[in-house]
Design a protein with these regions (language model features):
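Catalytic cores of the polymerase beta-like nucleotidyltransferase superfamily
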Residues: 1-233
Length: 233
């Protein structure tokens, strides 16, 4: 096991039973088809913090057509393409007829390059899991869980930052915020929602990037501010 993988075999048990069953079915189906599949992002962060339910998001080595084919064995009720450019496939599971269906998203490993300031990245599929995690905003969101092996993949020390209750940008903070200035508000939102502090270098980059929020649409800013205002501090 590499240094950035940690054995946490019981972490998946924190999922509600229906979501745990879906996760196991999907992971088994993808493994049988020869693909990697990981829970990724906010769901992993919130499982580690033992917080409430977060949407199930997966990342995979499979491209969308392979994802749709592999998912058949997991018996979803419907499959749809969320965004072809980003390699995302949505799966709907109607587990309980008395409850809302459970919708999950499965996205192909990808890297992103932002050649201009219009926020439209050039997306490359077929990269590694670590490459995929490296494009994410903060270390606490750059975490992936192998549901079957019970291994947490943590190449950017997100577990340490969770333990120290701090928001730290992945890699170069200035680059992360320049890629998408809305991340300035996202950092503030996570600090508010989780009661975390913001790492000094990350905070400096936020101050430098703040004026660039002027190029973000009012709708996106308003949506992020609404999420920020419901935080605890």
């Amino acid at each position: 096991m590499s240094a950035d993988r940690v054995r946490l075999p019981d972490l998946i048990d924190r999922l509600p039973a229906d979501e745990r069953d879906i996760t196991t079915r999907l992971a088994t189906a993808f493994l049988d088809a020869g693909h990697e599949l990981f829970l990724v992002g906010g769901i992993v962060r919130d499982l580690l913090l033992d917080r409430g339910r977060t949407d199930l998001d997966f990342t995979t080595s499979a491209v969308p057509e392979e994802t749709k084919a592999a998912s058949v064995a997991a018996r979803p009720d419907s499959v749809y393409l969320v965004g072809e450019e980003y390699g995302t496939v949505g799966l709907v599971f109607r587990v309980d007829p008395e409850a809302l269906p459970i919708t999950v998203e499965v996205t192909t490993f990808r890297s992103e390059v932002y050649p201009t300031e219009d926020r439209r990245p050039v997306v490359t599929h077929g990269v590694s899991l670590v490459d995929d995690l490296s494009r994410r905003d903060f270390t606490i969101n750059a975490l992936a869980l192998d549901p079957l092996a019970g291994e947490l993949v943590d190449p950017f020390n997100g577990i340490t930052d969770l333990a120290h209750r701090r928001i730290v940008a992945v890699g170069d903070a200035g680059e992360r915020f320049n890629e998408d200035p809305l991340r300035v508000l996202r950092a503030a939102r996570f600090a508010s929602q989780l009661g975390f502090d913001i790492d000094p270098d990350t905070l400096d980059a936020m101050r430098e990037t703040g004026p660039q929020l002027a190029r973000i649409s009012r709708e996106r800013i308003a949506a992020e501010l609404n999420r920020l205002l419901v935080g605890d501090r």
